[in-house]
Curated annotation (Swiss-Prot):
Keywords: Coiled coil, Nucleus, Ribonucleoprotein, Ribosome biogenesis, rRNA processing. It comes from Talaromyces marneffei (strain ATCC 18224 / CBS 334.59 / QM 7333) (Penicillium marneffei). Transmembrane segments: none annotated. Residues 17-37, 45-75 have a biased composition (Acidic residues). Belongs to the RRP36 family. Residues 115-147, 270-300, 320-333, 341-357 have a biased composition (Basic and acidic residues). Residues 1-229, 269-300, 320-357 are annotated as: Disordered. GO terms for biological process: maturation of SSU-rRNA from tricistronic rRNA transcript (SSU-rRNA, 5.8S rRNA, LSU-rRNA). The lineage of its organism: Eukaryota, Fungi, Dikarya, Ascomycota, Pezizomycotina. Component of the 90S pre-ribosome involved in the maturation of rRNAs. Required for early cleavages of the pre-RNAs in the 40S ribosomal subunit maturation pathway. InterPro entries: RRP36 (IPR009292). It is found in: Nucleus, Nucleolus. This is rRNA biogenesis protein rrp36.
Length: 357
């Protein structure tokens, strides 16, 4: 019974203290939450009545338990005390108003924010030593660069850029060793000089490639007539050359020199004869083209007729004999007859030996 009385006294003292604290908190919050306290008070009165009834019932139960369990150990008393404490705490929570809860929640949020700020400050303080390490590393790196001479070059380049007003390209880094291959840019500086007016140059003139004579390889035939007219004096030179060779042949008595002069005369005459034949061919073709064009204009033909090689050769011979005199024509015909006869004899088969007898 003595233990139960002591426990009851302690519980009552605690309840009185808690009621005093609740009254003090209610007085503080009465000015701020007047409207909300009316509903809270009605709820709190009901909760207080319930708590009082629960307390009375708990006291009766405690008395009965004390009478029945007076001889229990101290461990049982402690368990009872903890249960009573829980019930008291629950009753206290029931008596707290909503305004007090809202105010407490706001105060807890502010405390949390202050705690986060304190944590961030501590984190920055933790980072400070790492920043000092970075500073030390940066100083070491700068010292190494100064040893290599990079910092001086960069400073000079920066000064030049600031003075000139534009940024120049940084110099390439030095080689790792003297045996390393040298790096050379493939870019070549373009000269700033520009030729606005080209100077007049003396060009050599070659008549073989003169545009007045030959414009292109495809237009050689068209320009032959103009070339012949331009170099017609060469025909006179050739004729005079043949005449001089013949005079020398008549005057010389040396056999070897005569043979050389005869060969020179025959080569010159053959060359002249070939040029004359080409000239006749061109004349025949020009005459034929004119006739065909005239017939087409008159409407007698729709398409031109192109001569064959055999027909062209026949027409050239015809024109050649027409241009000759009677004596020259007879001589030429005789030479031609002999030439054809010799060819026919070569083509004939060999005669048999028995046929001769």
């Amino acid at each position: 019974m003595a233990i139960s009385d002591a426990l009851n006294k302690r519980l009552r003292a605690r309840r009185d203290e808690e009621e005093e604290e609740d009254d003090f908190e209610d007085e503080l919050l009465s000015d701020e939450m007047e409207g909300s306290e009316e509903d809270g008070r009605s709820n709190s009165d009901e909760e207080q009545e319930d708590s009082n009834s629960d307390a009375a019932e708990s006291e009766e139960d405690d008395d009965q338990d004390d009478e029945q369990d007076g001889d229990e150990d101290l461990s049982d008393a402690q368990s009872i005390q903890s249960a009573n404490d829980r019930e008291a705490i629950q009753s206290e929570f029931r008596q707290i108003s909503f305004g007090a809860l809202a105010k407490a929640q706001n105060s807890i949020g502010k405390k949390r924010k202050r705690g986060a700020e304190d944590k961030s400050d501590t984190r920055t303080d933790d980072k400070k030593p790492s920043s000092t390490l970075d500073d030390i590393r940066e100083r070491l790196r700068k010292a190494r660069e100064q040893k290599l001479g990079l910092t001086n070059n960069n400073n000079n380049n920066n000064n030049q850029n600031n003075n000139n007003g534009y940024h120049s390209k940084p110099k390439p880094p030095p080689r790792s060793s003297k045996h390393a291959p040298a790096v050379q840019s493939s870019k070549v500086a373009v000269s700033r000089k520009r030729t606005i007016i080209e100077p007049t140059t003396v060009k050599s003139r070659d008549p073989r490639f003169d545009p007045t004579v030959v414009k292109s390889s495809s237009s050689v035939r068209r320009n032959n007539s103009s070339a012949e007219n331009a170099y017609s004096f060469l025909d006179e030179y050739r004729a005079s050359e043949i005449k001089q060779l013949k005079e020398q042949l008549s005057k010389t008595k040396d056999a070897t020199q005569k043979e050389e002069l005869k060969r020179a005369i025959t080569s010159a005459t053959d060359r002249q004869r070939a040029l004359d034949n080409r000239k006749r061919e061109r004349e025949v073709l020009q005459e034929h083209k004119k006739k065909e064009k005239q017939l087409i204009k008159e409407g007698k033909k729709s398409q031109p007729y192109f001569l064959k090689k055999s027909e062209l050769k026949r027409e050239v011979l015809k024109k050649k004999y027409e241009s000759m005199g009677s004596k020259e024509r007879a001589k030429a015909l005789e030479r031609r007859r002999k030439k054809v006869a010799s060819k026919e004899k070569k083509d004939l088969p060999w005669a048999r030996r028995g046929m001769e007898n």
